[in-house]
Amino acid sequence: MFVGTAPERTEVVSADNVTVQLGGLPVLRGIDLRVHRGEAVALMGGNGSGKSTLVRSLIRLLPYQRGEVRLFGTPLNSFRAWSRIGYVPQRSAPVLRGAKVKEVVASGRLARRKPFLPLRAADRNAISQALDVVDLADRATTEMTTLSGGQQQRVLIARALAGEPELLVLDEPTAGVDLKSQRALADLLAELVGAGASVLVVLHEVGPLRPLLDRAVVLHEGRVISDGPVVPSDESKRLGRHEHDEQRPVSDQPWLGGAVER
């Protein structure tokens, strides 16, 4: 649907010995991670394990103090092709006041357009398609603040999809979303992965996304303690009750529809 290239066994994300401190306290301790083209990888772990910190560090929303990150083979500090990446933040982040659904989704095209120019046919088609995918086409002119939490999350997913990303990074996309919508998301992500896109997703429980996932990387106290097949649901519960990692308002994020503007 969004990506037309065939999967290749090339590294889309590579992180080596990544260390992050926040407020002088260690949050990530020597993280190594690989995500390949056409691969779906879950990040899992208990309270404060560093899942959200890791994904934000990988796309330069948070600085890391040590280590190396490469996106599509390019060192993070030199990476500029942000239109290749879509990012869906945690639903609990406040939404933009006064913004309508279609406006939020349209912002996902900014990295693929020249500033101040009107939407092209390709932009309008991508926006319309993304709204259809999340089943919110009939809410295009609705203000974000009037939507339920699950609907707001679906809008943020549509914004990322509108940019036609090759790498989709999602932070708890199923939190507060009904089972039907979770299954629809799983079907969508499976289609993207089948077309060659890569997915890195933070999850509390795998749920309907289980068949999609190639691997689960489990974090504990800022370290990788497991990297392999997805564990059974009863084993994942052993990781403990989930609380969201560090949160930042959507309005403060230096990205637009998954494209980090630098």
What are these regions (language model features)?
Residues 67-81:
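Conserved ABC transporter NBD signature motif
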Residues 121-139:
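Conserved ABC ATPase "signature" region
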Residues 143-147, 151:
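Conserved ABC ATPase signature
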Residues 164:
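Conserved catalytic motifs of ABC-family nucleotide-binding domains
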Residues 168-171:
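Catalytic Walker B motif of ABC-type/P-loop ATPase nucleotide-binding domains
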Residues 203-204:
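H-loop/switch region of ABC-family ATPase nucleotide-binding domains
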Residues 216-229:
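H-loop (His-switch) and adjacent beta-strand-loop-beta switch element
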